[in-house]
Amino acid sequence: MKKYTRQRLILDLIEENEIRTQEELSDYLEAHGVRATQATISRDIKELRISKVQTREGEYHYAIIDTVHDSLNERLDKIFRSAVLTIKHNEDMVIIKTISHTATVCGMAITNAKLDNIAGILTGNDTIYITVEDKSGLEKLVSEIKSIIR
């Protein structure tokens, strides 16, 4: 198995499970058909910047600390808050007007928020069109988008 594939699997396993030790991680990997030495797992953990975090119960488990991603999301949210002029909707879609040349970046902020019920996002120069998967959830989606501004 290629290094990238193994490391992607490690990230997925850590996101989906509370893994407390390298031995436990090794067991999960083996359950997925991947054999890796303790040294390899240790190197992967270091390269992937995986840390141990404490739970409310005082136990420790591995977690992905993605400070670069968090920082980018914070900047996108800040741009979104300052660039959005109006948020309106009809029965089929949400229409967001932005300051000129900021719709694409604002669309990225919405995408990164991973909101439910979005079928697709189309951005222009100063307008974002969002289509929904389920019309009954449109009002909730509008509220979630507005919460990014607050």
Swiss-Prot record:
Keywords for this protein: Amino-acid biosynthesis, Arginine biosynthesis, Cytoplasm, DNA-binding, Repressor, Transcription, Transcription regulation
First-listed, main subcellular location of the protein, grouped into a coarse class: cytoplasm
Gene Ontology biological-process annotations: L-arginine biosynthetic process; protein complex oligomerization; regulation of arginine biosynthetic process
Compartments (UniProt record): Cytoplasm
Pfam families: Arg_repressor, Arg_repressor_C
Amino-acid biosynthesis is among the record's keywords: yes
GO cellular component: cytoplasm
Alphabetized GO MF terms: arginine binding; DNA binding; DNA-binding transcription factor activity
Pathway(s) this gene product operates in, as recorded in its UniProt entry: Amino-acid biosynthesis; L-arginine biosynthesis [regulation]
Role of this protein: Regulates arginine biosynthesis genes.
Similarity section: Belongs to the ArgR family.
PANTHER family assigned to the protein according to its UniProt record, in alphabetical order: ARGININE REPRESSOR (PTHR34471:SF1)
Name of the protein: Arginine repressor
Species of the source: Finegoldia magna (strain ATCC 29328 / DSM 20472 / WAL 2508)
Upper classification of the organism: Bacteria, Bacillati, Bacillota, Tissierellia, Tissierellales
Gene: argR
